[in-house]
Amino acid sequence: MARGEKGRGEGPAKSALRKVRTATLVINLARGWQQWANENSTRQAQEPTGWMPGGARESDQPSGPVIHPTTHQKVQSAPKSPSPKPGGYGAGQSSEGATEVSPIKRKEVTKTIVSKAYERGGDVSHLSHRYEKDGDEPEPEQPESDIDRLLRSHGSPTRRRKCANLVSELTKGWKEMEQEEQEELKCRSDSIDTEDSGYGGETEERPEQDGEQVAIARIKRPLPSQANRFTEKLNCKAQRKYSQVGHLKGRWQQWADEHIQSQKLNPFSDEFDYELAMSTRLHKGDEGYGRPKEGTRTAERAKRAEEHIYREIMDMCFIIRTMAHPRRDGKIQVTFGDLFDRYVRISDKVVGILMRARKHGLVDFEGEMLWQGRDDHVVITLLK
């Protein structure tokens, strides 16, 4: 009974102590947040004001920063009545809280302000309007503006876009000029034919009209010389020859033609042409007979398999070289049974590799085929 009463007496005391600790923790946390809010508001008030829309109209007003009292400052400015704190927390604790460092971590963040698309619209339109002109340099007496610096710099996206458009227009203009020249020659030949036939109409007004047409044509575009025409033709041919789009289109067309031709020769395809396959197949003795077509995946797999088999042949020759001492003539001889017992631990293709090595002239043995158990006494000679 005494232990139960003692436990009941300690329960309220522990709960009261827990409440006091919780209240203390909340008070310290609130004090830290209040200190951080005060420091943040003071820092923001001391920082210079940034750019705001309509800054030209606001320049007439005094440039001093306007500080609006926050809710935290209003609460602090109001008179506070001292309230009793449990656990003996009085003015001493408040003085200690003022001197202690705020537990809230702060980190400086640098933010770059980038103008929006609608804000850059005016500059882009001004740049495009200026570039559409003849591209005159600014007058020497005028100071160089930001627009001139953008136009002179190589990193201007507007300038790159305009240059690309200008190049594309020039390439299109070459073809149009050729067509116009052909049309003019055709019209002149037709007019000469009509004059010779006598159905040209009034002969007095025609020379004046022809002169006006020639003048208008000269105002639009001067007549090119023979050298200029030759240069333009070369440029047009070069553009047609080295055009990226045309080159890509030609490559796709070439691939499509090759695919159609290969499907006609493929016996597993629905488009297989038996007569074409029989007429184009290789016969014994022709170059490439019995081998896959160069550049295909079958040829790549065959090359990898050949390299793998060659490595295994070299490994077998090395094993034979380590099994016995060379004779006086420099050749090494081992029996098939001993070689089989040694090499079977490395690979199970003992007979196949031996046959391949004999084909390449690296080893020699009697008989066309070797059988384990029956041909264990057969001597295998390493030639190289």
Swiss-Prot record:
What are the Phosphoserine sites (modified residues) in this protein? 156, 191
User: What does the entry give for GO biological process?
Assistant: positive regulation of Rho protein signal transduction; positive regulation of transcription by RNA polymerase II; protein transport
**Region feature (Disordered):** 1-20, 32-159, 181-211
Biased amino acid composition, Basic and acidic residues: 1-11
Give expression by tissue. Specifically expressed in heart and skeletal muscles.
Establish whether keyword Signal is in the entry.
no
Q: Where is the composition biased (Polar residues)?
A: 35-47
Q: Which UniProt key words apply to this protein?
A: Actin-binding, Activator, Cytoplasm, Cytoskeleton, Phosphoprotein, Protein transport, Transcription, Transcription regulation, Translocation, Transport
GO MF term set: actin binding
List compositional bias (Acidic residues) regions by residue number: 134-145
UniProt region (Interaction with actin), positions on chain: 243-288, 355-384
Q: Which domain of life is it from?
A: Eukaryota
| Region (Actin-binding 1) residue spans | 202-302
Per the entry, what this protein does is: Acts as an activator of serum response factor (SRF)-dependent transcription possibly by inducing nuclear translocation of MKL1 or MKL2 and through a mechanism requiring Rho-actin signaling.
Q: Which PANTHER family match?
A: ACTIN-BINDING RHO-ACTIVATING PROTEIN (PTHR22739:SF20), STRIATED MUSCLE ACTIVATOR OF RHO-DEPENDENT SIGNALING-RELATED (PTHR22739)
What does the domain comment read?
The actin-binding domain 1 (ABD1) is intrinsically disordered, and binds to F-actin with higher affinity than ABD2.
Q: How does it assemble?
A: Binds F-actin and ABLIM1, ABLIM2 and ABLIM3. Interaction with ABLIM2 and ABLIM3 enhances activity.
UniProt protein name: Actin-binding Rho-activating protein
| Source organism of the structure | Sus scrofa (Pig)
